[in-house]
């Protein structure tokens, strides 16, 4: 009987560990999935993908840094003792981040145009929106137990 319970315990343990692994992925796995999706949806050739995605992920990293600074500042707003002046600083930081992101988008559009046609860039950006929506749906879907 002990062997049965041990077997059952380890089986459940293995299944739960395996389930946790399938619900999350590393940043590199996520990037690879995103790259594959965008390339397929935008009908990029291997050559186009090889030139485009290093630029694309460079921009994503820069935007992540800009947004990280804004969200770090926003944590102050969780404190009930936050003053109006501090909230104003937080809001200004969000606006500053948006402006910085727009400037980066404009700068990187020129880099994109050096390797892709405008139509392909448009297709990538549309695919990116779809990808992000799909990811939100996955995240918001209640996990079955």
Describe each PLM feature range.
Residues 2, 68-74, 127-133:
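N-terminal hydrophobic signal/anchor transmembrane helix of membrane proteins
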Residues 34, 38-115:
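Amphipathic alpha-helical segments
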Residues 1-25:
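Bacterial Sec-dependent N-terminal signal peptides
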Residues 21-39:
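Short N-terminal segments immediately surrounding and downstream of signal-peptide cleavage
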Residues 25, 46, 82, 121-124:
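Soluble, non-transmembrane alpha-helical interaction regions
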């Amino acid at each position: 009987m002990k062997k049965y319970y041990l077997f059952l315990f380890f089986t459940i343990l293995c299944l739960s560990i395996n389930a946790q692994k399938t619900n999350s992925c590393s940043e590199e796995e996520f990037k690879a999935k995103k790259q594959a999706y965008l390339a397929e949806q935008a009908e990029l050739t291997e050559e186009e993908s090889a030139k485009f995605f290093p630029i694309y992920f460079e921009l994503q990293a820069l935007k992540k840094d800009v947004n990280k600074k804004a969200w770090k500042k926003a944590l102050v707003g969780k404190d009930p003792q936050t003053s109006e002046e501090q909230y104003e600083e937080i809001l200004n930081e969000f606006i500053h981040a948006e402006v910085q992101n727009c400037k980066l988008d404009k700068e990187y559009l020129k880099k994109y145009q050096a390797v892709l046609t405008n139509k392909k860039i448009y297709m990538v950006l549309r695919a990116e929106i779809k990808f992000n929506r799909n990811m939100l749906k996955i995240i918001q879907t209640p996990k079955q137990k």
